[in-house]
Amino acid sequence: MAKLTKRQKAIAEKIEAGKAYNFEEAATLLASLPAAKFVESYDIAVNLGVDPRKSDQVVRSATVLPHGTGKTVRVAVFTQGPAAEAALAAGADRVGMDDLAAEMKGGDLNYDVVIASPDAMRVVGQLGQVLGPRGLMPNPKVGTVTPDVATAVKNAKAGQVRYRTDKNGIIHTSVGKIGFEADKLKENVEALIADLKRIKPASSKGIYVKRVTLSTTMGPGLVIDQSSLNV
């Protein structure tokens, strides 16, 4: 068995195994643990009562967190004409069509979100092997293929998070950064879970939100007592 580091030992001493934590208690405890050498994110994992092997039970969507994620988001938009002007006015970092595609093919992929208007998909379609592996391919299911690119840019800049159930039926996403006030972090998590419940697959049976776990980038995961959340 690998020997625990000094930091891991200090963390283990503060964690109570098997406990379901009140949300505020969990957030405060995670923030008090020995810090990494960078500002860590708060991450959430939500175990859903779905069978991800069934296409009609794959949960995929996006949520605009009321207090954002604390991250600076770089956005590229594939569109043209008045929509291009609207995207720039909304805060897009780069707007283009074939010229932008050429830049991305050349390796310029310093973006967190890529958005496209429907008429631009003929260009974006050529970038599947470039954008797909990085999770950047625009998709109408998460609002990144839309005629209203300006709103999509505003949402991305405001802290919209995108998620999809993994092979175990769990969604993972960041919900803030260390330094967030516990009440704002809680409201972000509640907004996410409310959206997950809103898009519950009709074929999902039994308990839908089975477990909620809060962690930091380099820290442990703490199971949250769901009765401490207003959802």
From Swiss-Prot:
Quaternary structure and interacting proteins, as annotated: Part of the 50S ribosomal subunit.
Family assignment from sequence similarity: Belongs to the universal ribosomal protein uL1 family.
This protein's GO CC annotations: cytosolic large ribosomal subunit
CDD domains documented for this protein: Ribosomal_L1
Organism lineage: Bacteria, Pseudomonadati, Pseudomonadota, Gammaproteobacteria, Pseudomonadales
Alphabetical keyword list: Repressor, Ribonucleoprotein, Ribosomal protein, RNA-binding, rRNA-binding, Translation regulation, tRNA-binding
Superkingdom of origin: Bacteria
Gene3D superfamilies given in the database record: 3.30.190.20, 3.40.50.790
One MF annotation (Gene Ontology) recorded for this entry: tRNA binding
GO BP annotations listed: regulation of translation; translation
Organism: Pseudomonas putida (strain ATCC 47054 / DSM 6125 / CFBP 8728 / NCIMB 11950 / KT2440)
Protein task: Binds directly to 23S rRNA. The L1 stalk is quite mobile in the ribosome, and is involved in E site tRNA release. Protein L1 is also a translational repressor protein, it controls the translation of the L11 operon by binding to its mRNA.
PROSITE patterns attached to this UniProt entry: RIBOSOMAL_L1
The protein, known as: Large ribosomal subunit protein uL1
Pfam families: Ribosomal_L1 (PF00687)
Gene: rplA
Keyword Endoplasmic reticulum found: no
